[in-house]
Amino acid sequence: MFKLLIPNKYNYVIRPLVRFKSIKSPKSPKPKPTAKLSPNVFSSGKFSQLHNDTSTTNIESKITSFDQLKIFPSVREAMIKEIKSQYNLKGPRHSNIDEIDIKPTPVQIAAIRKINQTRKLKVPNKDLEGMDDAERIQFELQNANEIQKTKVFTVAAETGSGKTWSYLAPLLSKLKSDDMEFWKSDPEGYDNTRKKGQFVKSVILLPTNELVDQVYETLQRANSFELDHKGAPGNFTSFLELPENKTMNITTMKLGQGEAPVRLFRQLETKGPIDVLITTPGKIVAFSKLVNINRPFRVFANVKYCVLDEADTLFDDSFEKNTTDVITHFPKLLDLILVSATIPKVFEKKLSKLFPDQRSLIRVATPSLHKVPRNIKVMTIDADVAPYNGSKPRCLAQALYAISKDGTEPGYVKRIIVFVNEKSEVDGIVESMITKYKVRPEDIVGVSGSVNIRDRKDMLQPFLQPAELIENDDFGSKVKILVTTDLLARGLNFQGVKNVILLGLPRNSVDLVHRLGRTGRMNQNGRVFVIVDKKSKKSWVKGLGNAIIRGLRIG
């Protein structure tokens, strides 16, 4: 695939960082419900943009199964089937997906427990019958207020930790529980509403169309599995035996780029209520321009649950107004769930401004927040030394060649993601690799914001699905290379991608965490190669790999 560029003596000049033995610390006492975050690296200066003063959530190690968590039975079964369907079976350890025991991740344990907590107040020591009229009325009013007030959850966990199902599991459980309670109290009303209701029950907001597609496809897969409901508690049986509940039976819809909002109203008219709408804030704000539809925002009057995925982005300067405007159209909102892999300092300040009473925030933060998983190996390449002599493209070409010949992922097409800082660099790098370094045009694509959404989707497909066998690839590719910017560094699940190259350093620590997080997802191994020169060489770069091994936070 590649022309050999460098004499043999220079082959594989990618130098792994020196690994220093970490100093053993004395045994620590039993952890308390909250723990102070561990030290972090480069936590000062302009590069440092992450907030690291949040306490973490204590996560009980006794929970080792989704069966131990409060999840609606059909949601649990569909979720496990969906996770297994996306599991990477490469390697000798497992030959059959049924051998895989799917366990909840720390963020899934913590978020599901917090979000699914009962809203009802505990009855005081003396029961309701033992209260006088004044006490009973006061308790019932307080209970009603607790049930109806909006709760705000923040869910923060490291990249690749399973955050999508950490909010989907409680969200879908609440939707199904609401349906079951409605059916038990009024079967006829439930059936009529299911067929004719014209409203949206919940909304998931995301910053990019790629993420809208990703979450929508996750829900579509989960909704496609036939369920047997084995082991479901008796109080669920009659509801689960309804004909429509042979699957999870969640109605979903997405509004992405090029999809007119009027589609939502057509679907409501023909198919009834939508359980989950997945879209961007701008799409809902655009409803105000629908002059041919009477009171278009009326369909959101019954929204009870809203998720802001990649919440730090949705509250940055370019999204904040649209995001807050959208939320104001949900008058019956019960749960607002803010999800992110990073808590930037700017985002934390905005949270404090939006919710000055910090008691109104229910925080979930895993101990590994802002840490890069230890299964990611970071290596630096100095473009200033021979044979590169200051040429970062030459350095990149040699790195691509070395990866293609290293003997890993035998039989499969290797996927490599290359990050640059400016979208203006993308096309130039792709052109250089093809014309000067003889990379096949079929093996490399460049994706930036200037590429239309339909083409972007096609170009990204090989990276968003499990690796193909070389013999099955349409172009006979042994590697596929994606050159892109931070546009694609957030949230996207590049399935099983083992190699990421940073062509220079990102602007800040937030972007660094997200770029590193495109590999090593869900406990799989990954490698990151950081190409630096005299302009981008920082003293801490050579210590980054050691910081990861030691479990330090990115500052």
From Swiss-Prot:
Instruction: Report the SUPFAM superfamilies cross-referenced here.
Output: P-loop containing nucleoside triphosphate hydrolases
- GO terms, biological process: maturation of LSU-rRNA from tricistronic rRNA transcript (SSU-rRNA, 5.8S rRNA, LSU-rRNA)
Q: What is catalyzed by this enzyme?
A: ATP + H2O = ADP + phosphate + H(+)
Residue span(s) of domain Helicase ATP-binding: 144-361
Alphabetical UniProt keywords: ATP-binding, Helicase, Hydrolase, Mitochondrion, Nucleotide-binding, RNA-binding, Transit peptide
Q: Which GO terms describe its molecular function?
A: ATP binding; ATP hydrolysis activity; RNA binding; RNA helicase activity
- The UniProt record gives the binding positions of ATP as 157-164
Pfam families from the UniProt entry = DEAD (PF00270), Helicase_C (PF00271)
Q: In which residues does the motif DEAD box occur?
A: 309-312
Hydrolase listed as a keyword = yes
Localization? Mitochondrion
Using the record's annotation, list all stretches that form the Helicase C-terminal domain: 395-555
Copy the domain comment.
Answer: The Q motif is unique to and characteristic of the DEAD box family of RNA helicases and controls ATP binding and hydrolysis.
Its function, per the record, reads: ATP-binding RNA helicase involved in mitochondrial RNA metabolism. Required for maintenance of mitochondrial DNA.
Please state what the protein is called.
Answer: ATP-dependent RNA helicase MRH4, mitochondrial
